[in-house]
Amino acid sequence: MDHRLLEIIACPVCNGKLYYSQDKQELICKLDNLAFPLRDGIPVLLETEARSLAAEESRP
C-alpha cells in the first residue's frame, strides 16, 4: 500500500483517517469500526463492500 495514498484518502462514511492492515489487506476506519478491502492492491472504498469490525479489531 502506497503511504502517500494513505495520506490523502479518507473513509467514505465519516471522512476520517484510514489505517492500513497489512496482514488482512484492509483499510481500517477506527471511528466507524469498518474495514475496507483491497483488491489487487486497489482500495475498494464503498460502504457496501466494507465489513464491520469487532471492538477488539479496531484498537490500535
UniProtKB/Swiss-Prot annotation:
GO terms for cellular component: cytosol. Pfam families: Trm112p. Belongs to the UPF0434 family. This is UPF0434 protein Ent638_1436. It comes from Enterobacter sp. (strain 638).
